[in-house]
């Protein structure tokens, strides 16, 4: 069973999220959902903080459906959420895949991330996000600041961990996945994909197939 955690401004009905789900159905059952504040889901996005509760609920539901083995596959924001979920909920998942995730919070080193920070932190940006991207963002700052992805990674072991990142990612350069891999040490695996951009849009069917095979091989 795969539980797919989409990226920021994604949603269960977005074509790129549906494509990911279809590709993974070749390897097992798939649960998809929309994070809070995204698409038709209620509430407001906290951009990776309380979304860990949403993923936990989806994983619990997958278990209640009778699936004994569950792997989480997260993209960008969803990738950071998958890392924190695995660190905070002991034995919640049997394998974790994080694709295009940041290693640290508040990164503004690329133009796309500076635009994203404008969407999140400015009232006019949140209006654009609501009506342009169907994503409603909470106006409050994080308090407390959640565990960062790189801090979460060492707490995931012994659950198998796969970190996937494109070397042409326009949001987070390759020092992010390398930081995550270093934090995982020999408990994680890094795939640095040549020519790949960011998150679901950039994940080829071939890559999704390899991810599906990896999860099946590790989670059983």
What are these regions (language model features)?
Residues 21-42:
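Conserved alpha/beta-hydrolase
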Residues 74-78, 82:
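Gly/Ala-rich beta-loop-alpha elbow adjacent to hydrolase catalytic centers
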Residues 8-21:
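The serine-hydrolase catalytic nucleophile loop
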Residues 170-176:
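Conserved alpha/beta-hydrolase "acid-adjacent" motif
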Residues 196-206:
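Catalytic histidine-centered segment of alpha/beta-hydrolase-like enzymes
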Residues 46-65:
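Alpha/beta-hydrolase active-site loop
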Residues 156-157, 163-165:
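Short beta-strand/loop motif that positions the catalytic acidic residue
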Residues 90-141:
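Hydrolase active-site cap/lid region
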């Amino acid at each position: 069973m795969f539980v797919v955690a989409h990226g920021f401004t994604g949603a269960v009905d977005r074509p790129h999220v549906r494509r990911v789900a279809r590709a993974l159905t070749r390897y097992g059952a798939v649960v998809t959902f929309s994070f809070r504040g995204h698409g038709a889901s209620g509430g407001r996005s906290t951009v990776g903080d309380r979304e860990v509760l949403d993923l936990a609920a989806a994983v619990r539901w997958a278990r209640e459906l009778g699936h004994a083995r569950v792997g989480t596959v997260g993209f960008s924001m969803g990738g950071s959420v998958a890392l924190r979920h695995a660190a905070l909920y002991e034995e919640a998942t049997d394998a974790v895949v994080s694709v295009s995730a940041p290693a640290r919070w508040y990164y503004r080193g690329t133009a796309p991330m500076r635009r994203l920070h404008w969407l999140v932190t400015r009232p006019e940006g949140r209006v654009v996000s609501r009506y342009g991207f169907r994503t409603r963002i909470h106006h409050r700052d994080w308090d407390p600041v959640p565990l960062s992805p790189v801090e979460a990674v060492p707490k995931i072991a012994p659950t198998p961990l796969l970190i996937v990142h494109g070397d042409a990612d326009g949001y987070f350069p390759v020092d992010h996945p390398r930081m995550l891999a270093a934090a995982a040490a020999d408990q994680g695996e890094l795939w640095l994909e040549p020519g790949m951009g960011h998150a679901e849009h950039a994940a080829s069917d071939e890559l999704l197939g390899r991810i599906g095979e990896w999860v099946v091989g590790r989670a059983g």
